[in-house]
Amino acid sequence: MRFSVYQVSRKGGREKNEDRMGYCYTRDAGLFALADGMGGHPEGEVASQLALQTLAAMFQRDCKPTLPDPLRFLHEAIVAGHHQLLRYATQKALIDTPRTTIVACLMQGNAAYWAHCGDSRLYMVRGDKLVARTRDHSYSELQQTMSQVVPMGDRFNRNVLFTCLGSPGKPVVDTVGPLLMQAGDRLLLCSDGLWGTVSDSEITDQLSSLPLSDSVPELVEQALRNGGPKCDNVSVLAMEWEGVEGDSTMGIQTTSLGEAVFASTIQASVLGTDVSPDELDDAEIERSIKEINEAIKRSSQHKKG
């Protein structure tokens, strides 16, 4: 595989940044993911980090160096992250469960597969056209697609999500794929801090007209400017697909990797490759969360410095 990646996360006017993102890959498959911890619930930064760690751990365990069923993997790994959040809340005796949205894209062969829960989005741009976008799990999006079937009153809060990881009910996970990729196709994963103040057409224009190293920072800065002093955190992870074989001209090429090689930018945890996250004992969960909290503390101290 050959691809290039650029990612930026900026704290807006919120007390802390609860967005997390990263990617990992083997010789023949790549996983890109972003999660947005939800405000109004405890420890959103733990929720987003734990969801990504679970996803990455299962990818490392199962991808040898490909996955037999990418869509099934995405669905099961995202639901496993949900179960981890419920177990964490029980272990900590929390009154409420930490919650997060998530969007993840898997590249395998020459095809893309993706899944999401909540309102973190994926955009796919080919040339200067928006080819695909995820649909938010919000009542606003639901009204747009089902307005004739499910009318909603004016007082209804359309921005409320009807599903996320960590919620009491089973999460809704939408999956898409396979979608055959062409060289030059670009995928963008983002939190609602971006699309909440920057339109789909603006995202498409920037992504199609500039290199990722220019378009991603500009989109983030535009979102912060448009959002003002109380704007949400803005996180963006973008990937440009170059193809399956050959040398990468801009970023990462995996063809020379061994079958057992696994690389990741997602913070490592105690989630072993030979253990299902749903089968971890309480001591392992405790150690995992301790690692997360220590990393968050170090990150906070670094930003203050």
Language model features with spans:
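PP2C/PPM-type serine/threonine phosphatase catalytic domain
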Residues: 1-305
